[in-house]
Structure formats: C-alpha cells, structure tokens
Amino acid sequence: MITQCPIMPNKNFTYGFNVVGQEGTLWWHAHVPGLRATLHGAFIIRPRHGADSYPFPKPHKEIPVIIGDWWEKDLDEMARNMTKNIFSSYASASTVNGLVGDYFNCSGVAKEGFVLDVEPGKTYLLRIINAGLFSEFYLKIAGHKFTVVAADANYVNPYTTDVIAIAPGETVDAMLIADAAPGRYYMVALPNQAPLPDLQTPEYATRGMVKYKINHRPCNVTMAVSSIQGGEEEKEGYQGTSCDTPIGPKMPDVHDTITSFYFHGNLTSLRHQGHLLSQQRIDEHLFIVLGLGTICKQGQFCKRGNSSDDIQVATMNNVSFQQPAAATMPLLEAQYYHISLNGTAQELLRRPPTLYNFTYEALIPFGPKEMPLEPTYKAMLVQRFKHGAMVEIVFQSTTMLQGDSNPMHLHGHDMMVLAQGLGNYDLVKDVASYNLVNPVVKNTVLVPNRGWIAIRFVANNPGVWFMHCHYEFHLVMGMAAVFIVENGPTIDTSLPPPPDNCRTCGSNINLTPKEFYLQSKKSET
C-alpha cells in the first residue's frame, strides 16, 4: 500500500482535505487494479468568486463528458490474469457519460447515447475526462470546433482545434460554441493505437450527439446503426433538417498518433512560469526509460518465449515495481513515523543500466535484437527528494512498448512540460527546445510513442506519492515508482499525522495508526 490500507467490503471511509490554489476539472477513482473502470467520477473545482472570474467568457452551461469503457468480463480476474502474462480481456464497448451509443445493439434496440442539447449561439464548457483503462481517444463533434482553455485543472492559452486528444488520466476543458446550422451532429470518441507490426487490440468507437433546440416537425426516422473506422467521413458538412441523418465528423485514422503529438505540443500555460524556471537551478536529474522485460515466476531472468514460466513485466529503468510481500502499514504512515524501508525498497535508478538505441525497430518484442539488454527484476522502487527541490525528469519511450504512448501520472504534484519529441532524447540538442516561459502544467503527461518528454516539478508537497503509467495493463505490470518528499522546515511544510479514522491492515485492521505504531515499538523492547 502506498497511502492507505484498502477500504474493506461493507466498510466506509470519509476523506477530508483542503482545496487550495486549484481550479478546473479533476477526477477521482479507485486504485485497486481494474476497479477504476467503474468506480470513478468527475471532481470539479469552480472559482471561489463564481463563473464570472473565469479567464475566458462565461459559458451558458458546464457539461461533464466522461469517456470510459463498458466491460462484460470480471475486472478482478482480468487484473489477476495480467500478472500471469494472460492478456485476453478487453472492453466490449466505449462509452460517453456511461452510455454506449448507437454503434452497439445491446438489448435489441439501438439507442442514441449521450445527447447534449444546445441553443443556437450559446457557449458550453465541456469538462472532458478519459476514465478508460487502456486507450487514448480522439473526440470530435461534426461541424464544430473546440477552444481548449484548461488541462488537468490548469488554465492554458486558448487553443482552437477540431479534435481533442485525451489519454487515460487526462482532463481537458474546452469551450464549444453552438454556431452551426440547427440540426443534429454526432459527437464521436475514437480510440487510437499504433499500426502494424505493433500489437493490435480490439478498439471500439462510440458516439453521442449534439442536438440543437429548435422548433421542427416531428421526426419518425429511425437512427441508422452504422460502423465507423478512423479516417472515414460521415457526410460532414451536409446540412439538413433535424429529420435527416445526423452529420458525422471526419475522424483521424485509428492508427494516427501524430495528431495527438501535435495536440499536446500546442498546449501552453496561461500563467508564465518564468519565476520558477529562470533560475536554471536543477537539484535532481532523472532519465527514466519506459520498457518491457521478462522475469520467471520464481523471480529469475528468463529468455522470452523459451519457457512457459516467463512473465512479461513493464519497467522503469529496467526494474518492475512491486508492493512489499507482507505490508501491514502503508508507506505514507511509515514515512510519518520514521520507519525505515531498508530491506524492502530499492532506490529508483537515475538512468538506465545500459544505454542503447531506444527506438530501434528491431527491438519490437520477439525481434532479433530484443534480448541483449540487461536482465529485468522486480523491486519496490523509491526515490527521495528534499523539500523544495526542483526535479527534472526525461521520460524516454522504447520500441519494446509496441507503439503505445504512455500517460505518466504523478500524485500530489503538477508537472511543467518543457518539451517533447520523437526518437531518442538528445541532451544537447533537445535542451535548446525547452519552453522556459509558459510550459503547460499537468498532472498527467503523455510520453509519445517512440519518443520522449521532459518535465520539471517542485517537490513541495511532503509525503509519499505514486508515479505511474495510467494505462492499466502497464500499471499492473509494474510501470511505477514511489516518490517520497521529505518534510520542510515548518509545521505547514511537514507531513501531518494520519487521521484517527484511518485503519491499519491485515490482522491489525481495528487499530489506529498511532495504536499500531505504539504496539510495534512496545514489541521491540
């Protein structure tokens, strides 16, 4: 456990926290593997002084748009299977606000899915969240454009686009003006993935509808159920009455990852960060390579494909994260009570043990150059930072990841995105491209497919924080680490004690953290 013991069946836990210095769209979700597919929701922080204080025109309405998955399989079993190298479970459909839309005929009747009713000329603030487990999505509305105004609860310079690219864990706030001819317009969410020879997985688009509120004659036309493939056009630009077939958008190709690369690269912060970045003081440098490896079920190194006992794992600098085998106290409480992690934790390597051509085509899994790399193993990866340290991390993707971009999420902090690129990171050339004026600020950053991203953050929130990939299969496979931020010089910059209603784990489940700590100290004497 990182921050707390699980909430047991038929039990409850009340969270108490302060919202300070944040506005915008966030979301909450479970952190038990697979469970967040259904246990999640929007968490919206509005300005203290109301919508009139937004740094953009006051919208007529605010609408959450949550993209997710529909599962017909046991999610707990899926998570267990992934730890056994079984990857056969996929979502049966995609959803917008919990509705699968008319691509799917689940009960013998096709339903139109989520409908956004709009009035001509009005402006709507869409609070878009990707709560899916596995896929980045492209979101488009036929005949309309978006103006992106925020990402991950941080305001951005207004950016006009006809497509939103959003990875698992990310949020995007976008203004939509109902300025098209009155009618019905499809809202389509299309998952993307890299093309062959990378691994192909089942992907399902879904759609809702933007419907103009107008007086029109009754319409008895049944909405046609049709399929969509990225890159096909569904009569975009056709203007008809509300009884005609709704207008569909021209979507990016399902194998297009470049549109996402440019979407994320065009985001800049509305608030300049020069006061933080002009000092050029970097206290900690990390170069983290994201990859895949193989271990035996017994923990030894195996050559992939040569044994039924080998297991594929996801890695950061060639080590795969694992929880301690018998944890009775979350790491957050251990940090507060100054309990040593010696013997249970390993420091996250600041650079990979071996440098190589990370984006070399032959490194595709099962390829001829795959195995000369360093052996992989599992450990509880931890990296400590002094309070107030300026930390720079470069995340480097590899060909081994089979074309996946990787949404890396850091709990408890925002990250300034300095630059991104394709191919291998170049320490000399790429530093010159850093945006040190107004880099976009996010809590989830998308490492491009076979590319890199450079971020900085200030370690000013004391505690124990999870850094992990927001693709569920990569997280379950071990693409994660723990960042520990030490106490600052004052009470306000130090970790507070665990709340009294926070129970311990295992056989000590009825003890408060303080009772458990005192009992442990007594047993040592």
Question: Predicted segments — roles?
Answer:
Residues 1-3, 148-162, 168, 196-226, ...:
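Active-site pocket scaffolds in enzymes
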Residues 51, 73, 195, 491:
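Surface-exposed, flexible loop/turn segments at secondary-structure boundaries
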Residues 59-132, 232-234, 250, 266, ...:
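Acidic-aromatic/histidine active-site loop/patch
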Residues 54-56, 77, 494-497:
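Short, charged, solvent-exposed linker or helix-capping segments at domain edges/interfaces
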Residues 134-135, 194-196:
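Short beta-strands and strand-coil junctions in structured, solvent-facing domains, enriched
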Residues 253, 259-265, 272-275:
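Long, low-complexity intrinsically disordered regions
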Residues 1-72, 111-143, 164-189, 272-294, ...:
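Beta-strand cores of secreted/periplasmic/IMS beta-sandwich domains, seen most often
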